[in-house]
């Protein structure tokens, strides 16, 4: 099993190219099921979850090809299976996003209950309840969601009990081929939802309000394929900016989108970073200074993202002052804290809040990645830890970061993949 070996590094410096957003690419790939003609998606990152998504589409009978670049081609003319099996779904929670497209286009779907990062319940009931309101008959048997609809789904006025990106995306895709109008209230506003909506519109869907808490969809008879480019990964961008901040460096993230990171950039400025942006780049310069502690509370977009919580925990561990970080989105999302404490961090958990007293340096140690974003924080911690840090179980990292060791090396970081 691969590991990352990290040595203490100097201030990071240089340019890093940001990959396409995994959390946008996965639903967009699933949306290919809705298209009756060939569908081409570019700027798709080469990640384990993307490979699993492509394999899932092939399992359903779709033709999926990927060249040497970041482009994926999908043809569903031969799609003739409607079951997403456990062996594929167990490793990736986003597999549930195949449910809406299959049901909307073919009227039937069997999808194994999903896996993915172990950071809380993240129940699928919001997905199922919304589809039932659209006329689907759903049963859960032997670990499988079995969904059927006679004819086409029907438009519905859906009020979601809580904000859910995945449920918003699933219902949005399903509604594009439903009879009549669907309105999704309390919808997620994340940029990845907007990216999916823009892709669906390019395929012929009629959607208004993506990016607000009320999305209106007029169902159409059919959707066609298109050529669509996935948005930049805002969480990868934020992770590299944190790495530059804690190493007191200066980097530029290119092929990035600053408009999707306003809450993160504001907190980095509060921490003492000098931030400069262009239309597709972000530059951070710490001017050799130690970051200042910042208080964080995770909330749905456009507030501070839960996917940046672990990275800001690390920033505060090394910052000047005392801080609190409160997690309101997922339970069990402080599993990186015991590992950082093993490296010398001064932090304490009280319920869903972490209290952190900043220190100057960490000590290298052998640590274990527990989920995708926690693993990123541990790798960055290794850059500012005296001695050697070994991060085990980096298959979590490979689910969300493309060529991370090469990108860090390009900035001057001492990161090496080993067995």
From Swiss-Prot:
Q: Which residues bind phosphoenolpyruvate?
A: 22-23
InterPro entries annotated for this entry? Enolpyruvate_Tfrase_dom, Enolpyruvate_Tfrase_sf, MurA_subfamily, RNA3'P_cycl/enolpyr_Trfase_a/b, UDP_GlcNAc_COvinyl_MurA
Q: What is its main location?
A: cytoplasm
Q: Which GO terms describe its molecular function?
A: UDP-N-acetylglucosamine 1-carboxyvinyltransferase activity
Record-level GO cellular component terms = cytoplasm
Q: Please list the residues that make up the active site.
A: 117 (proton donor)
**SUPFAM superfamilies xref list:** EPT/RTPC-like
- Where, per UniProt, does this protein localize? Cytoplasm
* 2-(S-cysteinyl)pyruvic acid O-phosphothioketal carried by residues: 117
Metabolic or biological pathway, per its Swiss-Prot or TrEMBL entry: Cell wall biogenesis; peptidoglycan biosynthesis
- Give the catalysed reaction(s), semicolon-separated: phosphoenolpyruvate + UDP-N-acetyl-alpha-D-glucosamine = UDP-N-acetyl-3-O-(1-carboxyvinyl)-alpha-D-glucosamine + phosphate
Quick one: which residues bind UDP-N-acetyl-alpha-D-glucosamine?
A: 93, 307, 329
* Listed GO biological process terms: cell division; cell wall organization; peptidoglycan biosynthetic process; regulation of cell shape; UDP-N-acetylgalactosamine biosynthetic process
Q: Which Pfam families match?
A: EPSP_synthase
The UniProt keyword set, sorted, is: Cell cycle, Cell division, Cell shape, Cell wall biogenesis/degradation, Cytoplasm, Peptidoglycan synthesis, Pyruvate, Transferase
What EC identifiers does the entry list? 2.5.1.7
Q: What class of enzyme is it?
A: transferase
Per the record, the similarity remark reads: Belongs to the EPSP synthase family. MurA subfamily.
Biological role: Cell wall formation. Adds enolpyruvyl to UDP-N-acetylglucosamine.
Supply the NCBIfam families for this chain: murA, PRK09369.1
Report the protein name in the record. Answer: UDP-N-acetylglucosamine 1-carboxyvinyltransferase
Q: What broad taxonomic lineage does this protein's source fall under?
A: Bacteria, Pseudomonadati, Pseudomonadota, Gammaproteobacteria, Alteromonadales
């Amino acid at each position: 099993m691969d590991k990352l070996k990290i040595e203490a590094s100097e201030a990071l410096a240089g340019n890093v190219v940001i990959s396409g957003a995994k959390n946008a690419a996965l639903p967009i790939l699933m949306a290919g099921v809705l298209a009756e003609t060939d569908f081409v998606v570019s700027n798709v990152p080469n990640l384990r979850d993307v490979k699993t998504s492509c394999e899932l589409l092939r399992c359903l009978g779709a033709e999926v090809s990927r060249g040497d670049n970041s482009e994926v081609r999908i043809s569903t003319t031969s799609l003739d299976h409607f079951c997403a099996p456990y062996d594929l779904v167990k490793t990736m929670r986003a597999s549930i996003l195949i449910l809406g497209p299959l049901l909307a286009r073919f009227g039937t779907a069997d999808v194994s209950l999903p896996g993915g990062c172990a950071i809380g319940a993240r129940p699928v009931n919001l997905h199922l309840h919304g589809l039932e309101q659209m006329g689907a008959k759903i049963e859960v048997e032997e670990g499988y969601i079995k969904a059927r609809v006679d004819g086409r789904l029907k438009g519905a006025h859906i009020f979601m009990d809580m904000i859910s990106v995945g449920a918003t995306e699933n219902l949005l895709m399903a509604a594009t081929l439903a009879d009549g109008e669907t309105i999704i209230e309390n919808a997620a506003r994340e940029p990845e939802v907007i990216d999916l909506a823009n892709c669906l519109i390019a395929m012929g869907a009629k959607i208004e309000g993506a990016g607000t808490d009320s999305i209106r969809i007029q169902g159409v008879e059919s959707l066609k394929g298109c050529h669509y480019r996935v948005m930049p990964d805002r969480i990868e961008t934020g992770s590299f900016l944190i790495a530059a901040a804690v190493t007191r460096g200066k980097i530029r993230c290119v092929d990035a989108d600053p408009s999707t990171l306003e809450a993160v950039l504001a907190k980095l400025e509060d921490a003492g970073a000098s931030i400069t942006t262009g239309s597709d780049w972000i530059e951070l310069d710490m001017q050799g200074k130690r970051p200042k502690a910042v208080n964080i509370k995770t909330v749905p977009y456009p507030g501070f993202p839960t996917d940046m919580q672990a990275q800001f925990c690390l920033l505060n561990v090394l910052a000047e002052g005392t801080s609190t970080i409160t997690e309101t989105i997922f339970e069990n999302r402080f599993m990186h804290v015991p590992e950082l404490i093993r490296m010398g961090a001064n932090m304490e958990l009280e319920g869903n809040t972490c209290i952190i007293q900043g220190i100057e340096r960490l000590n290298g140690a052998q640590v274990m990645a527990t989920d995708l974003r926690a693993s990123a924080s541990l790798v960055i911690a290794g850059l500012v830890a005296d001695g050697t840090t070994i991060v085990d179980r980096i298959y979590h990292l490979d689910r969300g970061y493309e060529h991370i060791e090469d990108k860090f090396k390009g900035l001057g970081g001492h990161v090496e993949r080993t067995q």
